[in-house]
Amino acid sequence: MNKKILALCAAGLLFSMTGCEETMDPNDPQSVRRYLTKKQIGFTPNQFVSYAVNSDTAKMTLFLQASFEIDQPADNGNNAVAIAANKGNMMVLNYLFDHGAKANVQNGSGDMVIDNAVSMGNKEVVVRILEQLKKEGVASQNLATAVLLAAKTGKADMLEVLADAGAPLEARGPDGYLPIHWAVKNGNFDAMMFLINKGVDVNVKCGQGYSVLDWATNEGYPRLIKALKKAGAKNTKQYFKDSKG
């Protein structure tokens, strides 16, 4: 009788231990990793980013419980923040920032996430990223490229958001052009007027020595020319000389 009781107790203990092994402890990263392994879920950046793409925050939480580094990029160079920002997925973007993700990162093309967001033109996303960048202590001077992109693509609303965040509106790009030059070169009236109303220098020269009005004249934009002249813009002697040649 005693042997039977001992056997039953041993069987019960074995069953209990087996049950413990199958139970995941969300507070134990190793336990969560064992669970993922058992479920044949790869504990990789590619997998985590795919969850971000599909807005699966439950699975993302599982990875974070297993001590996944939230900013890791997938094989294509995009991390979860880059993907969420590009797709305009505010739910996932907020989730990521609330769980410690950084905004001051690059995407798979080597562009800063804020620059890509400005190019996409999603105001809500841009505002959220700017808030996060401020929390991270990123200087507003680092937003110069985003301003150039907004001016180049004629996104006056993006210029306004960036200006409100303290971004420099007169930073010269590597090509020698300022935002006002790009706005005019590409015929972006609203972007140009926003910059003028913000008090930028309308007679600043580009790296080639041409003024803003020179570019408006060269490209043939009557509406822009009229507004620039009203704001006090002038042509340069160099432009008249070169245009005759």
Task: Say what each PLM segment does.
Residues G108-D111, D115-N116:
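Acidic (E/D-rich), amphipathic helical modules within compact regulatory domains
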Residues C9-S16:
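Bacterial N-terminal signal peptides
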Residues M1-K4:
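Positively charged n-region of N-terminal signal peptides that target proteins for export
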Residues S50-S55, I83-N89, N116-N122, L149-K155, ...:
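Ankyrin repeat A-helix N-terminal signature
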Residues C20-P45, T57-A58, Q65-D75, M91, ...:
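Ankyrin repeat arrays, specifically the small/polar loop and inter-repeat linker segments at the C-terminal end
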